């Protein structure tokens, strides 16, 4: 899947105009890759545990331009579209969900 958030309205408009994401999945998890034009600027790694998508790592190769937020937003949208709950494990994702209370209903409870 490929998203260009510059074409979206509202909550995603803060990102660099040419930034796009691509989601790749396997049976056990996947990754979200962020591109600024042709340049890879970040990635997010996630795993599946039943109906829970666990955000394990977020890497931004360019800081301060919204790469991390773009990655978490993209995986959040993916989880919603698949009916999955989200477990933010990496510290960036934990803080992102704290700052976006409108998505609290998608969060899985930690056991």
Language-model segments: residues:
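A short, internal acetyl-CoA/4′-phosphopantetheine-binding micro-motif in the GNAT/acyltransferase core
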Residues: 57-64
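A conserved beta-strand-loop-helix scaffold within acyl/acetyltransferase catalytic domains
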Residues: 26-30, 36-52
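C-terminal structural segments of small proteins and small subunits
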Residues: 78-111
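Conserved acetyl-CoA-binding loop-helix of GNAT-fold acetyltransferases
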Residues: 65-77
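Short helix-onset patch at the extreme N-terminus, typifying the N->h transition
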Residues: 7-8, 24-27
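Core catalytic alpha/beta fold that binds nucleotide/phospho-ligands
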Residues: 20-22
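Short, Lys/Arg-enriched N-terminal segments with co-localized hydrophobic residues
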Residues: 2-18
């Amino acid at each position: 899947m490929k998203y260009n958030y510059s074409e979206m309205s509202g909550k995603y408009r803060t990102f660099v105009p040419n930034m796009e994401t691509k989601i790749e999945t396997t049976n056990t998890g996947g990754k979200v890759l962020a591109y600024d034009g042709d340049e890879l600027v970040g990635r997010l790694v996630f795993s599946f545990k039943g109906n829970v998508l666990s955000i394990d790592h977020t890497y931004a190769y360019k800081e301060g331009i919204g790469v991390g937020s773009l990655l978490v937003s993209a995986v959040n949208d993916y989880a919603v579209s698949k009916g999955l709950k989200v477990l933010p494990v990496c510290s960036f994702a934990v803080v992102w969900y704290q700052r976006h209370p409108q998505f609290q209903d998608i969060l899985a409870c930690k056991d």
